[in-house]
Amino acid sequence: MGLTKNHDDSKKTQIISESLDLLEWPTVCSHLSTFALTQQGRKKCESFDLPRNLSLSQELLSQTLEIGSLDSSLNEGISFDGVHDLENILLICSKGGIAIGEDLLKVADTLRAARKLRKLIFDQVIRPRLSELLKDVATLPDLQKLLEFGLDEGGRIADRASPKLSELRRYRNSVRLQRKDILQDIIRKYGGLLQDNIISERYGRPVLAFKAGTSDQIKGMVHDSSASGNTIYVEPQVVISIGNRLAKIDSEISDEERRLLADWSKEVGLNAIVIAHLVEILLQIEFALSRARYSKWLNGVPAILDQEEHSLFEIKDFRHPLLVWNDFHEKKNTVVPTSFDVAPDLKVVAITGPNTGGKTVALKSIGLAVLMAKAGLLLPCTGSPRLPWCKNVFADIGDEQSLQQNLSTFSGHILRISRILDAIDVFPGTTLVLLDEVGAGTDPTEGTALAMALLQVMANRARLTIATTHFGQLKALKYSDSRFENASVSFDSETIQPTFHLQWGIPGRSNAIEISKRLGLDEQVIISAQKFINPERVDNVNQVIQGLEKQRERQQSAAEDAAALLAKTELLHEELLNSWQKQRQQSEEFNE
């Protein structure tokens, strides 16, 4: 029984990650990660959890805006130089292990960088949200100074770390110099017996290269010979005792170095919790900075998120972030903005239009807009976008899972939609549902019936459902239920090309035959297809829709003309006002 329940729960939660994948949210996060400054920052951007409530989303947005403003005001921006990933180092030290000098220096560098960042960012008036994060962060200056005093660049333990270490190293250098002088004397004395005048090393011992057959001329220990046998490497007897003395000194130095590393590691271990908290706060700040820089790159604007479920969706000229990314890297400018204007009482929008017209892009755009706002990112659009905070975003786009499971397209859609319906029950809250080609993949009559029934169910259970479709009957739902609305991807009848613009309140025209003709389908097939349809009925519908489109264009053009006229009027008013004030001031000065 328990196993069955867990399996059912897993199926219901599966749709959450599946929907994110279908909307290509992981790719957006991957793009976000390129604006991070550290490896751990990049990992955070790629795998963060979306906020579970509105206040957390608002917190993230405030952090994004605060650090973005600061970053833009600095010539070289905010730097995270010196910040390191300390997770493994802290684990070693907290368990009583001994960290190497290089790792301990990373701790010191991170503490120094943290104090510098805290000083730069902390301002409870200008940056209250970030300051709240940093308020209780301890940067442990005494520990930083201890480690920096004892360690040189690269993590080498400095001579100054302890008097004993300094004395031992000086003594070792003195003995090494003594041994070198003795070996140089031997080279001068026995130069004729040597292959060269170089002091070499074998197995940690100093040796001289004697010619074969001459090594018995001097007492010593043979450590090696050349491959040809022509050279014998001998450590002269006179320096063997010195070498033994150096080995003992090296051992004492190693013991002292190990003692120092152990002491410092212990100090780090005692402060591991404090340091881990500091590193986590730095990661949150870097995450905020990454969001700010990505948002700036997108020319984004902050969205207003509403707690009220029945608030409007108002997003103007949204540019799909992945298309913006592709355009930038391909040096193009082809992204067509999409606008959404969904009234509070609307529950279902049916988008119709040609396959090549960008219906799926529009579907993904609103899904990504909701996710980006939820994650504290600015939206790549204009104006002041406003939308409800959505707890759930569920999507059925494409049939990737169907292919993986060897299911038909229709079966794949139905299974995913079933998971969406189950998830709405399990995860109550404001929900956005996105359905691509709803009811497709089966008999059109039954598919239409299923699509209509499904959208009516969604109207009762989700805040907003947006569905793309080819079924003409779905366009009629708005006339029997005020919660439904139509939208379409506009189509240029002159060029027989989709414009990729989303039009609200106008259903899409049937352009299948025109598109097929443009794509080069055999002319006889086109002629035969035209005979199978009722031309009068189709022409009437298309003429009505075309008339609506032209009326919309005229209204939009008139609105643009009115806006331009208003702008000119306001400018003229401002100029007249300035002129009047200037004349008045001159008159007052003259009277004085």
For the regions a language model picked out, list residue spans one by one.
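Conserved amphipathic alpha-helical "coupling/scaffold" segments
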Residues: G2-K164, L168-Y171, N271-V274, L278-A292, ...
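ATPase nucleotide-binding head domains, primarily ABC-like/P-loop NTPase cores
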Residues: E308-R552, S557
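Terminal-proximal interaction/regulatory segments of ATP-powered molecular machines
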Residues: A559-E592
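Extended, Lys/Arg-enriched charged tracts that mediate electrostatic binding to polyanionic substrates
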Residues: L165-S215, Q284, L312
